[in-house]
Amino acid sequence: MYNEQVNSGKSIKEKERYLDALLKILKDNPVTLKEIGWDLPKGLLQFFSRKNINVNIHLVFSPLVSSVMECFNELAINGNPKECLLTACELVSTLHIVLTETGDSDEENEDLNDSNRNDASNITDELSVITPEIGHYMAKNTVEFIPNLKIYVLFEFMSLLLKRVDTLYPSKFLAMVTSAIIKYVTTNVQAMDDPHFILRIVYNFCTNYSPAQPSASLTDGISTNDLEKIHDDESALQKKLLANLSVFVISNCLKNHPGNIDKIYFKTLMHKKTDENEIDASVLQICHQYYEYVTSLDVHMKELLEKCLVESRSIYNSLLMNPAASTPEFKEEINQLVYEVSYAYQIKKLADEKNLELDQYGVVILSAIHYSKNGTHLLPQIDIQSAIYLYLRCTTASLFSEIYENKFLESSVRYWLWVSTTETSTEKIKCALQELPGHITTAFLQMLLMKTCNESNNDTKLTEITLLRRLLYLMPESTSFTFIFETLLHCPYITAKIAVLDILRDMMIRSPEAANRDETVGLIEQQNPGNTANSVPIMPTLPPRPYITINEDRMASIHSIALICFSAAKQKKRTQGDLLLVLTYMKFFVSLRNKWDLGLLTLINKEISESFQGEGEPELAFINISNNTLGEYIEEMNIRS
């Protein structure tokens, strides 16, 4: 209570003198401290506030911070470790990062700045308790500064207390601490702007963890064999708890961080250097350290990933085990169930969980971190079906709850999609995709397209579109065309329509045989540099078949949905997106004019000429430029005929 009075009504200098006096009392009265120490941490933490600490300077210039930390240090040394640990866990689990900042008065700020200036030159000998890491800490977001300072002190406090708890079963107290940390992370992860800080202090806590050896009073009367068994069991359980905490933190603290593991791999494939601005080196470095630490705890990442892949496949295969799976009604229902099953499975698994299992999302993230750390794949090969099931499992749950939205995880599963399409022969990939159930293929392509269109970073979006394009190239021709057509017809997002229409244009122009054909011709020319009378004549080859062939039905289908698009764009309430889609259609028709039906092109040309004249919108000018090009081609063809 007196803490509250001092903290609310006294000046900074008076608070510093009070804390110094309190520290002296704690040091002089260890017996009393052991009795009442559990009640002090909450009051001490209240001195960590923006009215007491200037968040814009390093903590080494704050005597108040030093005094509070020394008080915690004294509590850790002479307080009752079990009672103090219980208090610390309660404080950690209830600590919140509040996103709204409260402004301090000018008088308080001036008082605070004067105190910092007056004492800055006299505190060198007082700061031994402040480590260099926290002493020079300045939060990226000032809202997080005070909560981060509190959580740092509590972590250090708990770490010291765990070294003093006298018990045969230290895992009991470690479990209590890890549970509190997990609750803190779960509660505050959305407010964390600086994942590196919490990752670092959890890493330090885990790697520095060292339980006290039980005293003779606890071991007396227990045989050596029993003690060894207790020790071995405890050691194994402590490793599980630390691994569980580490993998959980990797999974949750990185959920708002882009990761970019897929971009790193893609740039490597393209023989391009990754832009340093795209990579958060400090976060990647701590991720690499986590990977090393987790694997040092007898966690076999390769086995865990393989198990995760098998489990992911079984989640979706279970849909077909329904006795009604062959009925038409169920086939319609299954298209919706494929989006829901991952979320339902996750909820059921959490409810039924009895053993300590590693966070599966964290396992997937660490499997991708293995590549960024070592430059090699944890699994040298992964089949495309497994990668697709993994992608669906890790992305669809976010449709039903935002707690499963995880950017780093999405980057990791896209990375495995890239691996599956680059480390396996094209023939095997095509066969596997052909055997994939239709409802899985559709849901996968729709999720990948939706996530791509929602991506805010243009470079990341380009990488994702390239991945989608590659997968559509590898899909059966009818599957790819049907997906693109259905997207153009039914998808409510214009950005998605523009993306797939660009892909369709490329797939109707480009051919998988073209590259191989060019290489073959070049090789023949090298072997036969001269065209002599004895030369073997080269038979003319058929024109290469594009990824998607153009026929009357497909031309008519695209023509129909283009007219639907034009009709929407003619309305007074049209958006810029509507005009951009019209422009994309015009680019499509201009690019394919040599392959398209002349009569259909004439109708398109006439519709644009009549409906999209005028000025004021820049897209109209580009639409008419494309239409003029189309008109010139039509006129030329009519003259030739």
Swiss-Prot record:
Q: Which domain of life is it from?
A: Eukaryota
Q: Which compartment or compartments is the protein found in?
A: Cytoplasm
Q: Check the UniProt entry and state the signal peptide residues, or none.
A: none
Q: What is its main location?
A: cytoplasm
BP-aspect Gene Ontology terms: cellular response to oxidative stress; mitotic spindle organization
**Which GO cellular component does the record give, naming just one?**
cytoplasm
User: What is the deletion mutant like?
Assistant: Increases sensitivity to H(2)O(2) and decreases activation of YAP1-dependent gene expression.
What UniProt keywords are attached to this protein's entry? Cytoplasm, Stress response
Similarity comment text for this entry? Belongs to the YBP1 family.
Task of the protein: Involved in oxidative stress response and redox homeostasis. Required for hydrogen peroxide-induced activation of YAP1. Acts in a parallele pathway to YBP1.
What remark does the entry add? Present with 3900 molecules/cell in log phase SD medium.
Q: What protein is this chain from?
A: YAP1-binding protein 2
**Species lineage:** Eukaryota, Fungi, Dikarya, Ascomycota, Saccharomycotina
